[in-house]
UniProtKB/Swiss-Prot annotation:
It comes from the Bacteria. GO terms for biological process: fatty acid biosynthetic process; phospholipid biosynthetic process. It is found in: Cytoplasm. Pathway: Lipid metabolism; phospholipid metabolism. This is Phosphate acyltransferase. The gene is plsX. It is an enzyme of class 2 (transferase). Catalyzes the reversible formation of acyl-phosphate (acyl-PO(4)) from acyl-[acyl-carrier-protein] (acyl-ACP). This enzyme utilizes acyl-ACP as fatty acyl donor, but not acyl-CoA. One of its GO terms (molecular function) is phosphate:acyl-[acyl carrier protein] acyltransferase activity. Homodimer. Probably interacts with PlsY. One of its GO terms (cellular component) is cytoplasm. Keywords: Cytoplasm, Lipid biosynthesis, Lipid metabolism, Phospholipid biosynthesis, Phospholipid metabolism, Transferase.
Length: 326
């Protein structure tokens, strides 16, 4: 794909619209995108911010989708930035759309406004996790579908494999998250899903994966339902910040040698922080809908917004949606 159009939800996120404006400027300054490739969806903006982005295409959208907006309500808010952005995806006016707004509302807009791809029953949230091997580990579904059937795991695997291609992972290994590795472990849905994936010769299915193996080199794609996946994600996030907090407290309370040791390890500690910092990952893909849809973290700052725009741009150039085999 030669030229692309990437849309950004002006009102999405806790720090919007200022974080979105600054993120757009950050992306332009660092040459992630050109002014011709970036579209701001939403027009209720201060004159000061408007002056900063006057050279960009701005698409009118009046209604704000708040964190309290229910997924069903957004479908009636046809003048909201979220609805307009997903409609532009559907009409091929955008190649990708990024929002840091209400997750449930965005997933609803993606599914019912942009629409599902042919042959996909359940779109899913797909993201890359850090791992011991420094290769990305793909988690799908990370929170879109709390209640699933066994057949939906088949869709999740296809979506994960498409994302693996985007990350240059060849012949990715697919595993199902379970409470044990034995065939008889898990509930009936998980066991039925395992049989479905075993039968599909296109999948490099390696069986069950336990939660303690999340960061090991046991597989490349971890498939699970959205309820479990979202809890995995939030547990990881909470654990990471707890460890960092305890590390800082230990250094603060330690003696001279502890502080000197921390000084020598400063570069390594910074690398560790960057590895678990959501801002460096940009966003989560909602795959299975008609177009590249990226969910940025709700508390995204300008840097995180810029990174989300960058991954959306790369995915659009890669024709990620075309890589989901039907």
């Amino acid at each position: 794909m030669n030229s692309v159009k990437i849309g950004i939800d002006l009102y999405g996120g806790d720090n919007a619209p200022s974080s979105v404006v600054e993120g757009a400027l950050f992306a332009l300054k660092n040459k992630f995108l050109s002014p011709e490739e970036l579209v701001i969806v939403g027009n209720e903006i201060s004159k000061e911010d408007l002056d900063k982005i006057s050279n960009l295409q701005i698409v009118p959208a009046k209604n704000l989708v708040s964190n309290e907006t229910k997924p069903t309500e957004v479908l009636k808010m046809k003048e909201s930035s979220m609805y307009v952005g997903c409609e532009m995806l559907k009409n091929n006016e955008l190649n990708a759309f990024v929002s840091a707004g209400n997750t449930g509302a965005l997933l609803s807009s993606g599914t019912f406004v942009a629409g599902r791809l042919p042959g996909i029953k359940r779109p899913a949230l797909v993201l890359a996790l850090p791992s011991k091997s420094n290769k990305p580990k793909i988690l799908v579904d990370a929170g879109a579908n709390a209640e699933v059937k066994a057949e939906h795991f088949y869709d999740f695997a296809r979506e994960g494999i498409a994302y693996a291609k985007f990350l240059n992972l060849e012949n990715p290994r697919v595993g199902i998250l379970n409470i044990g590795s034995e065939d008889e472990k898990g509930n009936s849905i998980v066991r039925e899903a395992s049989n479905l994936l075993k039968e599909e010769k296109k999948f490099n299915y390696v069986g069950y994966v336990e939660a303690r193996e999340l960061f090991d080199d046991t597989c490349d794609i971890i498939v699970t339902d959205g309820f479990t996946g979202n809890n995995v994600l939030k547990t990881m996030e909470g654990t990471a910040y707890f460890i960092l907090h305890e590390l800082k407290e230990t250094i603060k309370k330690g003696g001279l040698f502890t502080k000197l040791g921390a000084l020598f390890l400063r570069g390594s500690l910074k690398s560790l922080v960057n590895k678990i910092d959501y801002r460096s990952y940009g966003g989560t893909f909602f795959l299975g809908v008609n177009g590249v849809l990226v969910k940025a973290h709700g508390s995204s700052d300008a840097e995180a917004i810029a990174n989300a725009l960058y991954v959306a741009y790369r995915a659009a150039k890669f024709d990620l949606i075309e890589k989901i085999e039907i």
